[in-house]
Swiss-Prot record:
This is Aspartate carbamoyltransferase regulatory chain. Binds 1 zinc ion per subunit. Involved in allosteric regulation of aspartate carbamoyltransferase. Keywords: Metal-binding, Pyrimidine biosynthesis, Zinc. Contains catalytic and regulatory chains. Belongs to the PyrI family. Zn(2+) binds at residues 109, 114, 138, 141. The gene is pyrI. GO terms for biological process: 'de novo' pyrimidine nucleobase biosynthetic process; pyrimidine nucleotide biosynthetic process. Its cofactor is Zn(2+). It comes from the Bacteria. GO terms for cellular component: aspartate carbamoyltransferase complex. It comes from Tolumonas auensis (strain DSM 9187 / NBRC 110442 / TA 4).
Length: 154
């Protein structure tokens, strides 16, 4: 079998492409960031070959343009990812992700005694990175958690 096979993911006309997601994080990102709530077509590539990562995940959301703030929230789970905004099959904007200072309305607080569970407020976490470890501090109960604990509580 000397025939070389190439994996192809269909191009989109307009929308957002989240590329260079670490393999295994694509499904988590779809769920945590409510990308499955859209009625637009979503194309997901899992464990695709990548020169830089070995393997990667990829998400394409048609007719949806992620803002820089939305894109930066992805940096918690995919710090090396890029978000490309596509118009008429061309990349018009490329967001290099930066860890945001705050994340609002994405995760629930893991502290069951937090007032955010009983009051009609959006969750709100301050984000800090110390010596490579990312921690999220709840605005309401002021408890601090690792990103893994917060995403599991989701």
């Amino acid at each position: 079998m000397s025939e070389k096979k190439q994996l192809q993911v269909e191009a989109i006309c307009n929308g957002s492409v989240i590329d260079h997601i670490p393999a295994g994080q694509g499904i988590k990102i779809l769920k945590l960031f409510h990308l499955l709530d859209t009625r637009q077509r979503i194309t997901v590539g899992l464990n695709l070959p990548s020169a830089a990562l070995g393997s990667k995940d990829l998400i394409k959301v048609e007719n949806t343009q992620l803002t820089a703030d939305q894109a930066n929230q992805l940096a918690l789970f995919a710090p090396q990812a890029t978000v490309n905004i596509i118009e008429d099959f061309k990349v018009v904007t490329k967001h290099q992700l930066e860890l945001p200072g705050e994340i609002v309305g994405v995760f629930a607080c893991p502290n069951s005694n937090c007032i955010s569970h009983r009051e009609p407020v959006r969750s709100r976490f301050g984000v800090r990175s110390t010596q490579g470890e990312v921690r999220l501090k709840c605005h309401y109960c002021e408890k601090s958690f690792t990103k893994e604990i917060v995403s599991e509580a989701f």
